């Protein structure tokens, strides 16, 4: 969107939402709206139903783990006190507007936000995916269960503290004639590239 359209949309959001919005920022030609988790259900309805907004389509929803998000590893970005966020990407077909909405879960140990399925039914599988991969609970979701990992999977693989090798591995046991689980046998290791610091290395002597 052009700068003038972004500025108008930001002004409309501030006017319509008032104190219910925490922050509106613009980067790379997109607006990001930050709201409290307690206000999410009401704000979602306003974003969809208000004639000046009309965000009738939820394009995508994802979870984010900010536990290792700091100025030490991500220059120019502020670390958040709250660990988990849910990010929604919305589209207004009528006005041809796009909006990113970010909501932080208040509890780092048991992250929970309200489901937006009553407003955007397409959130169904998106919320199940965020639940499966990040362990974020979506209140009032009618069928909140894993969608990508196996039924007996332990943990949430997109959390920063989840081991890269996982906890268990599965294989086919010819004796039992079925797939079995066993503790992972891969040993974690750090691979450091070998750097040769000789300035003339590899040059043939003339």
UniProtKB/Swiss-Prot annotation:
Protein keywords: Cell inner membrane, Cell membrane, Membrane, NAD, Quinone, Translocase, Transport, Ubiquinone
Compartments (UniProt record): Cell inner membrane
Entry EC number(s): 7.1.1.-
Bilayer topology: Peripheral membrane protein
Cited Pfam families: Complex1_30kDa (PF00329)
Reactions listed under catalytic activity: a quinone + NADH + 5 H(+)(in) = a quinol + NAD(+) + 4 H(+)(out)
Gene Ontology molecular functions: NADH dehydrogenase (ubiquinone) activity; NADH:ubiquinone reductase (non-electrogenic) activity; quinone binding
Keyword Isomerase applies: no
Cellular-component GO terms for this entry: plasma membrane
Enzyme class, broadest EC rank: translocase
Keyword Cell membrane: yes
Chief localization: membrane
Subunit: NDH-1 is composed of 14 different subunits. Subunits NuoB, C, D, E, F, and G constitute the peripheral sector of the complex.
Protein's job: NDH-1 shuttles electrons from NADH, via FMN and iron-sulfur (Fe-S) centers, to quinones in the respiratory chain. The immediate electron acceptor for the enzyme in this species is believed to be ubiquinone. Couples the redox reaction to proton translocation (for every two electrons transferred, four hydrogen ions are translocated across the cytoplasmic membrane), and thus conserves the redox energy in a proton gradient.
Family under the similarity heading: Belongs to the complex I 30 kDa subunit family.
Designated name of the protein: NADH-quinone oxidoreductase subunit C
Gene from which this protein is expressed: nuoC
């Amino acid at each position: 969107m052009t700068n003038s359209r972004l500025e108008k949309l930001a002004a409309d959001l501030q006017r319509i939402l008032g104190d219910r919005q925490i922050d509106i920022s613009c980067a790379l030609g997109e607006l990001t709206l930050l709201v409290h988790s307690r206000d999410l259900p009401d704000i979602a309805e306003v974003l969809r139903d208000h004639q000046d907004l009309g965000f009738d389509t939820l394009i995508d929803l994802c979870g984010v783990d900010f536990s290792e998000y700091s100025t030490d590893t991500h220059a120019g970005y502020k670390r958040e006190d709250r660990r988990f966020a849910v990010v929604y990407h919305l589209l207004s077909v009528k006005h041809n507007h796009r909006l990113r909405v970010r909501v932080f879960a208040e509890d780092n140990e048991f992250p929970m936000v309200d489901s937006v399925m009553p407003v955007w039914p397409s959130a169904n599988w998106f919320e199940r995916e965020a639940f499966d991969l990040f362990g974020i609970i979506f209140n009032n979701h009618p069928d909140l269960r894993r969608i990508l990992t196996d039924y007996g999977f332990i943990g949430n693989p997109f959390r920063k503290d989840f081991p890269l090798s996982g906890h268990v591995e599965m294989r086919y046991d010819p004796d039992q004639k079925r797939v079995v689980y066993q503790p992972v046998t891969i040993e974690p290791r750090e691979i450091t590239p070998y750097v040769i610091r000789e300035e003339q290395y590899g040059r043939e002597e003339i």
